[in-house]
Amino acid sequence: MKFFFNILSICAISSSFGAFKAVGNELDEVICNAMKGMQAKEEKKIPYNIGDYELIGITVDCKKKALITEKKHIQYSLSDFSEDYKINAIKNWEKANCKNMIFNTNTGWSTTQIIQDTDKNVVLKLKANFETCSQ
């Protein structure tokens, strides 16, 4: 999870420097380039453990303005995840990502994390973007 916060920090810094000069598509290009650079760096390490999870995928889709990460729990099956887990995960995801200017301003960019169980069944799909962050 720490790597993801580093990703968002890099993107925030890159876009804040570029925001003074960039307008519209230029800002998208700055964000895209920052995320693509981070993706290339992180892909070299995949898969790797993050606490109880293994990071198994990271994708940046500049046309859709989306950052997607996938992680798999190293012990839990689908039935092992409680409702409290899902509620807390959603709150934590939004709280962490809505602090980032890429997702809390109307840039059109979103971040999604797909959480899977040990058998790669989807447990939860978390998303943060301007719409969720402005509620």
Model-derived regions: residue spans:
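Cleaved targeting-peptide boundary
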Residues: 17-31
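Classical Sec-dependent N-terminal signal peptides that target proteins to the secretory pathway
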Residues: 1-20
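Short, intrinsically disordered, charge-biased short linear motifs at domain edges
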Residues: 20, 82-88, 116-123
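Solvent-exposed amphipathic alpha-helical surface segments
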Residues: 15, 41-45, 97-101
